[in-house]
């Protein structure tokens, strides 16, 4: 089975070793064909507390780590400061 990956933006880093990542999914409406965007918020494991609000990150699915945490940060693609 393939590993699921998503790319999103960190919207909250107030928890210890956990960040909230918003992933935008864009798709055409089945009847009207207008592009619709839906945002899903994932609680993601961040072992070293490296992520900050505004960072663009790649997340991967993992084993359940808590009641609501099933994803882990794979890499920080861009930081809020722009590097």
Swiss-Prot record:
<dbReference type="GO" id="GO:0003735">
    <property type="term" value="F:structural constituent of ribosome"/>
</dbReference>
<keyword id="KW-0687">Ribonucleoprotein</keyword>
<dbReference type="InterPro" id="IPR019984">
    <property type="entry name" value="Ribosomal_uS17_bact/chlr"/>
</dbReference>
<dbReference type="GO" id="GO:0019843">
    <property type="term" value="F:rRNA binding"/>
</dbReference>
<keyword id="KW-0689">Ribosomal protein</keyword>
<dbReference type="GO" id="GO:0022627">
    <property type="term" value="C:cytosolic small ribosomal subunit"/>
</dbReference>
<dbReference type="InterPro" id="IPR019979">
    <property type="entry name" value="Ribosomal_uS17_CS"/>
</dbReference>
<dbReference type="Pfam" id="PF00366">
    <property type="entry name" value="Ribosomal_S17"/>
</dbReference>
<dbReference type="InterPro" id="IPR000266">
    <property type="entry name" value="Ribosomal_uS17"/>
</dbReference>
<protein>
    <recommendedName>
        <fullName>Small ribosomal subunit protein uS17</fullName>
    </recommendedName>
</protein>
<dbReference type="GO" id="GO:0006412">
    <property type="term" value="P:translation"/>
</dbReference>
<keyword id="KW-0699">rRNA-binding</keyword>
<keyword id="KW-0694">RNA-binding</keyword>
<comment type="subunit">
    <text>Part of the 30S ribosomal subunit.</text>
</comment>
<comment type="similarity">
    <text>Belongs to the universal ribosomal protein uS17 family.</text>
</comment>
<dbReference type="InterPro" id="IPR012340">
    <property type="entry name" value="NA-bd_OB-fold"/>
</dbReference>
<comment type="function">
    <text>One of the primary rRNA binding proteins, it binds specifically to the 5'-end of 16S ribosomal RNA.</text>
</comment>
